[in-house]
């Protein structure tokens, strides 16, 4: 599918693949086992300019878009979905600034993120507000010169490691979904602390923590967009970043296929490589076909967004559900091809299977995505009448 990419994007893919193989692959098992945050790898990504790819040139970036983000996310995830999340999670925390930040905010935050000096994160989910995001309880009370934040955010990617956080909090409970606002909150603000690092099934190299706010003062200048526009910030951000999750899923699936192909040529049973058996061949064929279909959808949606299309919620959700469902299927099939070896932790496909599952859950469960798609389909029919 590289015919969809520019020459610069093809070079970006090649560079990212090289970094993934040379820097991430040798440490993949270590970070999965220890669950340490991969700061040494983050520094390698930063020195290669990968955090710059989707940030405009005037703020220290390379001026790329969602397609560039997808290229990097796919190639990093092809080797390790967990380590890739330090990059993808930062994109999620950065896009609200790109989309809604004023000039002062962009100049303050984007250059350091582009250089990889600071990671970013996004805080919407709460203990009792997952899919029902409109039921968030974190409060932002207006006071002289700013706001006091009180509440808890849960399962935040890059939590505790990032320096810059986009937080959605309620500023006027009486207005429902229109009563939430988005704020830039910096690590180190008084009253802002972190809970324990979660122990997860997969993506173990990624830090997931609770964010706690106790009378945390946030300056008025840190309001992102308009007061009451918090959910607009969140939804428009997800439209841009869900193809990144899809690309992560795609990369995990491709990595699993790579491993399954290699193993099927080396593993012999009944005096011949298992790749000579029709059942294995059909599994490999199905895996490859599903991956190519996912790749076509992911990159066509990314290109649609980069073309300037305004309404992309339906397509963005389609890319996420299709690619993540493919990742879960393909990684499971890869484990099956490996047989008993696939269930052992010293072979990579069991990790890929664990990593794949989260792509069906975060940035909106696939059930929620199907609802978004259906709602948009119905709206399209109604608008034509």
Language model: regions and residue ranges:
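Helix-loop "lid/cap" segments that line or gate small-molecule binding pockets
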Residues: 91-100
């Amino acid at each position: 599918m590289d015919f969809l990419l520019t020459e610069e994007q093809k070079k970006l893919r090649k560079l990212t693949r090289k970094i993934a193989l040379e820097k991430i692959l040798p440490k993949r098992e270590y970070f999965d086992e220890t669950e340490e945050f991969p700061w040494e790898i983050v520094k390698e990504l930063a020195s290669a300019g990968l955090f710059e790819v989707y940030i405009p040139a005037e703020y220290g970036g390379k001026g790329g878009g969602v397609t560039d983000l997808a290229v990097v996310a796919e190639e990093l995830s092809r080797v390790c979905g967990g380590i890739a999340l330090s990059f993808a999670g930062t994109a999620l925390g950065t896009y609200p600034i790109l989309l809604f930040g004023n000039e002062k905010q962009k100049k303050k935050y984007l250059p350091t993120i582009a250089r990889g000096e600071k990671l970013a994160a996004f805080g919407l989910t709460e203990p009792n507000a997952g899919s029902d995001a409109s039921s968030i309880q974190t409060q932002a009370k207006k006071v002289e010169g700013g706001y006091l934040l009180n509440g808890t955010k849960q399962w935040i990617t890059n939590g505790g490691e990032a320096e810059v956080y986009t937080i959605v909090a309620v500023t006027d409970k009486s207005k429902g979904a229109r009563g939430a606002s988005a704020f830039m909150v910096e690590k180190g603000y008084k009253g802002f602390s972190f809970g324990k690092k979660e122990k997860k099934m997969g993506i173990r190299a990624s830090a997931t923590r609770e964010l706690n706010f106790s009378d945390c003062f946030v300056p008025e200048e840190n309001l992102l967009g308009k007061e009451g526009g918090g959910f607009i910030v969140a939804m428009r951000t997800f439209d841009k970043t869900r193809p990144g999750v899809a690309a992560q899923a795609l990369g995990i699936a491709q990595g699993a296929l790579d491993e399954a192909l290699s193993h099927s040529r080396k593993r012999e049973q009944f005096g011949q490589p298992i790749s000579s058996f029709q059942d294995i061949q059909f599994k490999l064929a199905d895996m490859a076909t599903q991956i190519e279909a996912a790749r076509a959808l992911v990159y066509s949606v990314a290109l649609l967004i980069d073309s300037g299309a305004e309404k992309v919620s339906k397509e963005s959700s389609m890319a996420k559900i299709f690619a993540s469902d493919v990742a879960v299927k393909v990684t499971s099939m890869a484990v099956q091809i490996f047989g008993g070896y696939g269930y052992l932790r010293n072979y990579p496909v069991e990790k890929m299977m664990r990593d794949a599952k989260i792509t069906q859950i975060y940035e909106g469960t696939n059930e929620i995505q199907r609802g978004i798609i259906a709602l948009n389909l119905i709206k399209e029919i109604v608008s034509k009448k």
